[in-house]
């Protein structure tokens, strides 16, 4: 029983393989027929002078042919005597088995038979290629008739498509020849590549009609004709420029209420502009500022330019502050000239003359006490007067200021607050310092006249050494305050240490640390009632 079943199974398997081989043969016939039709169409197109590109599926068809041959070769390699595995019933695999020549012969025979049928014009098997890939059932007579009918319909449709394509290719070739030769066709609408909008020169009636019947909507930006967009934009710009100068044109598109509001706003702006221009002029009609003299009245007839408003916006705020603009403008120009002259004088003046005003009152105090004090040793005074002029210039002037100068500074600040409208914080500080220095110069002259009397008394009390030291001592008194005070303190009868660390006496040796030396000697020193030691802030002990 087992052997009979095996034999039946082998016979059934052989029958299935035969069916598959037949289906593959039919598929190959259809592919060969299709390939031959494509070649015929290509030859025909070449004869007509139209270049046709190669079909894209040629490579895929070759792959299909190779796959068909492999499938046809695979199942036929086994011999009738060898058993077939159950999983290989689909027939898509190739097994390395014996006897491959018979299968090759059958496949080649099928290919040749298909080619022979095609050359003889046999029935088309194009509809069977979908079922030929491993279909297990047999193809009946009904299937053959339906497939033949479908293939004929497909052939008819394909022939019509080829004819249409040939006509279009002929039209394209003729159009290209005419374009090269410069000949216009009588009916350019038929050419699907023709676009009269891209052409230049005079337009014919047909092209003009076509352009008028454009696909663009009339409300689109630029209208139906896109070439008029650039010229339309230029005309619009010119009209806008012309409308800027005249205000009546702007009101044409306004309603009554908008027009009245616009006219009221326009009058207010013109009034403000005129007031601003009047603030910039003197009562005589001249410009207050020199750089405005270049302006002409014609610049403001249509209204001032926006750049003019921007350049004077900050000035308008500054001019509105003072109560009397005309007098302030005149004073401001004079004040600026004075400030520049003061700066020149300050730069040319020596730096040492700025400080002496701070200690002028204290010098009077020390000079009045000098009259009751006897003279000190001449050698110590001469040493101190020779060494101090160079050292006193190095000492910085303290930041203290007498109450009189504070009052003067306040007065100067009030004047500057009225004078400076734009740059109050910057120029006030510089101008106050310059005013104070000028007033200090005047007060210095007064104090020099007042100090001439005490100086004469000094010369009378100390006739021995004062004439020698006066040429050096007098300028130091005008320049630096601590120097004459220190020199006068040396005139006390009680021997005291030098008031300034840099002017030692005869018997004193210089030391490295003067602070320590002063602390050691301060308890044993004797001072007059009202005098101060050198370590204290003696210039401010006037209270």
Curated annotation (Swiss-Prot):
<feature type="modified residue" description="Asymmetric dimethylarginine">
    <location>
        <position position="129"/>
    </location>
</feature>
<feature type="compositionally biased region" description="Basic and acidic residues">
    <location>
        <begin position="309"/>
        <end position="318"/>
    </location>
</feature>
<dbReference type="GO" id="GO:0003723">
    <property type="term" value="F:RNA binding"/>
</dbReference>
<comment type="subunit">
    <text>Probable component of the exon junction complex (EJC); the association is RNA-dependent.</text>
</comment>
<feature type="modified residue" description="Phosphothreonine">
    <location>
        <position position="94"/>
    </location>
</feature>
<keyword id="KW-0597">Phosphoprotein</keyword>
<feature type="compositionally biased region" description="Basic and acidic residues">
    <location>
        <begin position="38"/>
        <end position="47"/>
    </location>
</feature>
<feature type="compositionally biased region" description="Basic and acidic residues">
    <location>
        <begin position="256"/>
        <end position="277"/>
    </location>
</feature>
<feature type="compositionally biased region" description="Polar residues">
    <location>
        <begin position="376"/>
        <end position="394"/>
    </location>
</feature>
<feature type="compositionally biased region" description="Basic and acidic residues">
    <location>
        <begin position="146"/>
        <end position="183"/>
    </location>
</feature>
<feature type="modified residue" description="Phosphoserine">
    <location>
        <position position="135"/>
    </location>
</feature>
<keyword id="KW-0488">Methylation</keyword>
<feature type="modified residue" description="Omega-N-methylarginine">
    <location>
        <position position="126"/>
    </location>
</feature>
<feature type="modified residue" description="Asymmetric dimethylarginine">
    <location>
        <position position="131"/>
    </location>
</feature>
<feature type="modified residue" description="Phosphoserine">
    <location>
        <position position="374"/>
    </location>
</feature>
<feature type="modified residue" description="Omega-N-methylarginine">
    <location>
        <position position="106"/>
    </location>
</feature>
<feature type="modified residue" description="Omega-N-methylarginine">
    <location>
        <position position="120"/>
    </location>
</feature>
<feature type="compositionally biased region" description="Basic and acidic residues">
    <location>
        <begin position="192"/>
        <end position="212"/>
    </location>
</feature>
<feature type="region of interest" description="Disordered">
    <location>
        <begin position="38"/>
        <end position="543"/>
    </location>
</feature>
<feature type="modified residue" description="Phosphoserine">
    <location>
        <position position="384"/>
    </location>
</feature>
<dbReference type="GO" id="GO:0035145">
    <property type="term" value="C:exon-exon junction complex"/>
</dbReference>
<feature type="modified residue" description="Omega-N-methylarginine">
    <location>
        <position position="128"/>
    </location>
</feature>
<feature type="coiled-coil region">
    <location>
        <begin position="147"/>
        <end position="183"/>
    </location>
</feature>
<protein>
    <recommendedName>
        <fullName>Coiled-coil domain-containing protein 9</fullName>
    </recommendedName>
</protein>
<keyword id="KW-0175">Coiled coil</keyword>
<dbReference type="Pfam" id="PF15266">
    <property type="entry name" value="DUF4594"/>
</dbReference>
<feature type="modified residue" description="Asymmetric dimethylarginine">
    <location>
        <position position="133"/>
    </location>
</feature>
<feature type="compositionally biased region" description="Basic and acidic residues">
    <location>
        <begin position="287"/>
        <end position="300"/>
    </location>
</feature>
<dbReference type="InterPro" id="IPR029336">
    <property type="entry name" value="DUF4594"/>
</dbReference>
<feature type="compositionally biased region" description="Basic and acidic residues">
    <location>
        <begin position="59"/>
        <end position="72"/>
    </location>
</feature>
<feature type="compositionally biased region" description="Acidic residues">
    <location>
        <begin position="405"/>
        <end position="453"/>
    </location>
</feature>
<feature type="compositionally biased region" description="Basic and acidic residues">
    <location>
        <begin position="225"/>
        <end position="239"/>
    </location>
</feature>
<feature type="coiled-coil region">
    <location>
        <begin position="422"/>
        <end position="452"/>
    </location>
</feature>
<feature type="modified residue" description="Phosphoserine">
    <location>
        <position position="533"/>
    </location>
</feature>
<feature type="modified residue" description="Phosphoserine">
    <location>
        <position position="246"/>
    </location>
</feature>
<feature type="compositionally biased region" description="Basic and acidic residues">
    <location>
        <begin position="359"/>
        <end position="372"/>
    </location>
</feature>
<feature type="modified residue" description="Phosphoserine">
    <location>
        <position position="253"/>
    </location>
</feature>
<comment type="function">
    <text>Probable component of the exon junction complex (EJC), a multiprotein complex that associates immediately upstream of the exon-exon junction on mRNAs and serves as a positional landmark for the intron exon structure of genes and directs post-transcriptional processes in the cytoplasm such as mRNA export, nonsense-mediated mRNA decay (NMD) or translation.</text>
</comment>
């Amino acid at each position: 029983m087992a052997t009979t079943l095996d034999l039946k199974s082998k016979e059934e398997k052989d029958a299935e393989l035969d069916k598959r081989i037949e289906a593959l043969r039919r598929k190959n016939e259809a592919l060969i027929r299709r390939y031959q039709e494509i070649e015929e169409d290509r030859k025909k197109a070449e004869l007509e002078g139209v270049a046709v590109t190669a079909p894209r599926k040629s490579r895929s068809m070759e792959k299909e042919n190779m796959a068909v041959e492999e499938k046809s070769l695979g199942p036929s390699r086994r011999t009738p005597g060898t058993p077939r595995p159950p999983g290989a019933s689909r027939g898509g695999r190739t097994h390395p088995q014996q006897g491959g020549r018979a299968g090759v012969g059958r496949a080649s025979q099928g290919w040749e038979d298909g080619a022979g049928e095609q050359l003889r014009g046999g029935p088309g098997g194009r509809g069977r290629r979908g079922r030929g890939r491993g279909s297990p059932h047999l193809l009946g007579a009904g299937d053959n008739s339906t497939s033949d009918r479908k293939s004929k319909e497909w052939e008819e449709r394909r022939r019509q498509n080829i004819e249409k394509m040939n006509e279009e290719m002929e039209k394209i070739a003729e159009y290209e020849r005419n374009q090269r030769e410069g000949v216009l066709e009588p009916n350019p609408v038929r050419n699907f590549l023709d676009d009269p909008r891209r052409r230049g020169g005079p337009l014919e009636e047909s092209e003009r009609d076509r352009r008028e019947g454009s696909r663009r909507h009339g409300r689109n930006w630029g209208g139906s004709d896109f070439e008029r967009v650039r010229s339309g934009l230029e005309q619009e710009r010119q009209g806008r420029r012309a409308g800027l100068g005249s205000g009546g044109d702007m009101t044409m598109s306004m309603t009554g209420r908008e027009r009245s509001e616009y006219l009221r706003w326009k009058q207010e702006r013109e009034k403000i502009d005129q007031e601003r221009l009047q603030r910039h002029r003197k009562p005589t009609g001249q410009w207050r500022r020199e750089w405005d003299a270049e302006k002409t009245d014609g610049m403001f007839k249509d209204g001032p330019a926006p750049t003019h408003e921007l350049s004077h916006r900050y000035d308008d705020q500054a001019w509105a502050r003072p109560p009397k603009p005309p007098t302030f403008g005149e004073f401001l120009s004079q004040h600026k000239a004075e400030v520049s002259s003061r700066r020149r004088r300050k730069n040319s003046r020596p730096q040492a003359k700025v400080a002496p005003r701070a200690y002028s009152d204290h010098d009077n105090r020390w000079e009045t006490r000098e009259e009751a004090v006897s003279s000190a040793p001449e050698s110590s005074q001469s040493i101190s007067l020779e060494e101090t002029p160079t050292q006193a210039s190095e000492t910085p002037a303290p930041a203290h200021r007498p109450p009189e100068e504070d009052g003067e500074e306040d007065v100067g600040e009030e004047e500057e607050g009225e004078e400076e409208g734009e740059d109050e914080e910057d120029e006030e500080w510089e101008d106050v310092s310059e005013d104070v220095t000028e007033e200090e110069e005047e007060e210095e002259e007064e104090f020099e006249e007042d100090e001439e009397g005490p100086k004469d008394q000094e010369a009378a009390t100390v006739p021995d050494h004062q004439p020698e030291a006066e040429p050096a001592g007098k300028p130091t008194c005008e320049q630096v305050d601590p120097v004459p005070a220190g020199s006068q303190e040396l005139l006390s009868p009680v021997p005291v240490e030098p008031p300034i660390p840099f002017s030692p006496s005869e018997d004193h040796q210089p030391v490295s640390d003067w602070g320590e030396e002063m602390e050691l000697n301060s308890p044993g020193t004797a001072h007059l009632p009202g005098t101060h030691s050198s370590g204290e802030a003696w210039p401010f002990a006037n209270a």
